[in-house]
Amino acid sequence: MEETLSIIKYKPLEGCEDQFEEELQKLYEINKDSGFADKATVKFTKLDDGSFIQIMICPTMDVLIEEQDEGLAWLDSVDHLLQKDEHGSRTEAVTGFTFNWS
């Protein structure tokens, strides 16, 4: 079993931070209703620049993949609230397997 860590950064448009935070709360409720929150650790934080970070720690990559369609549907629903980079991406994200030295 390979624990998987995924970190996603969202940058709301200026003036949309509060509305986006409300939508993140809805995402958390979606995660609870689907059972994802029972299988994974999901945390959110807000940075000083107004960006939001979502951190997910899943017991396996499969757990993360199972939730992918729901997550992308949510992301599409908040597209109008997000800044996009020069390539049109709405997020900055990294995903990988965790490891330790014990």
Feature-to-residue mapping (PLM):
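Absolute protein N-terminus
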Residues: 1-2, 102
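Short, solvent-exposed loop/turn elements at beta->coil junctions and helix N-caps
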Residues: 41-45
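Short tyrosine-centred short linear motifs in exposed loops/low-complexity segments
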Residues: 1, 14-16, 62
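Active-site-flanking beta-strand signature of metal-NTP-handling nucleotidyl enzymes
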Residues: 3-11, 53-55
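An amphipathic, aromatic/His-enriched active-site/gating alpha helix that lines ligand/cofactor pockets
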Residues: 26, 30-40, 57-92
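Short, low-order "capping/linker" segments at domain edges
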Residues: 94-102
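Short, surface-exposed ligand-recognition loops at beta-strand->loop->(often short) alpha-helix junctions
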Residues: 11-23
